[in-house]
Amino acid sequence: MRLENWPIVEMFRSRPGVPNWPKFGLFAVGVIGSAYLGYRYATPSEEDIVRRMNPELRERYMLERDARQEYFNEFVKEAIAQSKTNEPIWKVGPMASKPIDFNVAVREKMKEIEARNDQDRNERIKNELAAIAKKEEEEKNKKGWW
């Protein structure tokens, strides 16, 4: 089938007395709308991403999210307090907010999680080594003197 005979080409072919701008507008709306819908349905939400994380990473994300939210709340309170003064912003000076530093409880919890992960990993390695040694022993016992 030749390109000139396609229905989409026929639709956009100019005819006397029919303006082209409505056709092109309809085409543009279709392209932009399909791109938007494709983006909307193909992009996972934040909850979907968190749900797919492994448990340790999810726990760490939740702890850090709480710390970030706490920092943001303090920042907003300070900004509101400074905005209530009648002085210009250059006289108020810089905000006294500190750089993002997770609180001590988050750090301790992260150390606890990492220690637990290290213990689990060491235990798994010991079990794998024991299974390999047992398998080698069985293979050694299977062989006869021949």
Curated annotation (Swiss-Prot):
It is found in: Mitochondrion inner membrane. One of its GO terms (cellular component) is mitochondrial inner membrane. Its main location: mitochondrion. One of its GO terms (biological process) is mitochondrial respiratory chain complex III assembly. The chain crosses the membrane at residues 21-43. Keywords: Chaperone, Coiled coil, Membrane, Mitochondrion, Mitochondrion inner membrane, Transmembrane, Transmembrane helix. Residues 103-143 form a coiled coil. The keyword Coiled coil applies. It is a single-pass membrane protein. Essential for the assembly of ubiquinol-cytochrome c reductase. It has a direct effect on the correct occurrence of the Rieske protein, core 4, core 5 and apocytochrome b. Belongs to the CBP4 family. This is Assembly factor CBP4.
